[in-house]
Amino acid sequence: MSEQNQAADAQQDENKLIAERRAKLAELRAVGNPFPNDFRPTHHADALQQAHGSKEKAALEEAAMVVSVAGRVIRNRGAFMVLQDGSGQIQLYVTKEARGFAKSLDLGDIIGVSGVLHKSGKGDLYVNLDEYKLLTKALRPLPDKYHGLADQELRYRQRYVDLIANPEVRKTFLLRSRIVQFIRDYLNGREFLEVETPMLQAIPGGATARPFETHHNALDIDMYLRIAPELYLKRLVVGGFERVYEINRNFRNEGLSTRHNPEFTMLEFYQAYADYNDLMDLTEDMLRNLAQTVLGSTEVTATLGEDESVTYDFAKPFVRLSVFDSILHFNPDLKAEDIDSPESARAVAKNLGIPMKDNWGLGKVQIEIFEKTVEHRLIQPTFITEYPTEVSPLARRNDDNPFVTDRFEFFVGGREIANGFSELNDAEDQADRFKQQVAEKNAGDDEAMHYDADYVRALEYGLPPTAGEGIGIDRLVMLLTDSASIRDVLLFPHMRPE
């Protein structure tokens, strides 16, 4: 039988089951409300397992504790059912009086149950169905328990079913929440202030990216979904908030990949009277403590292939290499003179098959060589520093070498996780760099920055020496949950319409 015929038969079977369930719902409507809202559980499944799972059977019998639980029926066989709530699963014992009720249920129905808590001879907790009520009639059948929801695209489209059917998916998103909460606690504990800045901006700034465009009808102006909150956060530092951070969405009208989604979550934070070295130290400490607190270990194991894995060690001091030195380190056939002039660097890039534009300077060519030959090889936690000024329009020039900036990017597993730098606080230098970005935009670079006159004006009031950083929350969660695609850590990733 062809796959197409199998799919058609499966759809026909599902339609039949849905019709049968709709008929049951009609019968329930005829005798009352099949969607009541008057049941209140006293316990969750996991809390019961934690509090009473180790107790002796006799002790539970003697206690005769009555509990109320609510959730979805995911198994219904004979004398026992399995109920799944937001915390986990627990068994239900079908008493003689409850057999008719149990028989009327379909997998996926949501019920409320009150009864005495017991332990079986095998050591499993269960709740007697002494009192019971249907709370929600499910009209669509759950995926087969042995195969789960296997279709990857369907999992992303119908995440609500994915969460019901696949416990590991639930675990990933619970862990994501804990990661974000740890970061908030860590920064709050260091006197950072959480703020919110505009998502709709008249001038998109803070990053080099193509924005989403919209129109504000009341003001009759074109606006953009923000690509980064950076320039607003630094305005707040000018205003006297010396440590600020924001965890929120950014939007970039660019391609989809396993590492990119047009809508994504970023942490950005700024600290006055600090430089990029201070933020590298902070990042190293934060990530080390994050792994230990959330995962219980500073060693994070990730899958590279079917039979290959790697362990990222967050306990050791993170490697620190400049862009220039990293190119030479990972390309031992190259010498310094091969990449220290526009002509020689272009020759190297050409040999690597890198397409180039005529207006690229040495710094841009070096970054292209770095991304082609180095980035994917940065497996253990590594800071890459001293990015060329040409590709760092908001970063402070290095005092000893103005060709580069006091900037770093942080990599693990060949993925960029963070980007930070000592902030450019020279208003005149910033204005000149904005003008250069505008020239590049006029030359056809859609990702080049706009000129932000108000931000330059803010700098003219004086931005104290400041360092700032952005960390991609989605990529960080991918790293710590060993997820292969960014879609695996987004509850509702973008998809084409069905």
Swiss-Prot record:
Instruction: Name the CDD domains for this protein.
Output: LysRS_core (cd00775), LysRS_N (cd04322)
- Any one biological process term the GO annotation gives: lysyl-tRNA aminoacylation
Cite a single GO MF annotation.
tRNA binding
Residues recorded as binding Mg(2+) 1, renumbered to this chain, are 409, 416
Annotated positions binding Mg(2+) 2:
416
Q: What is the organism of origin for this protein?
A: Teredinibacter turnerae (strain ATCC 39867 / T7901)
Q: What name does this protein carry?
A: Lysine--tRNA ligase
Could you tell me the EC number(s) of this protein? 6.1.1.6
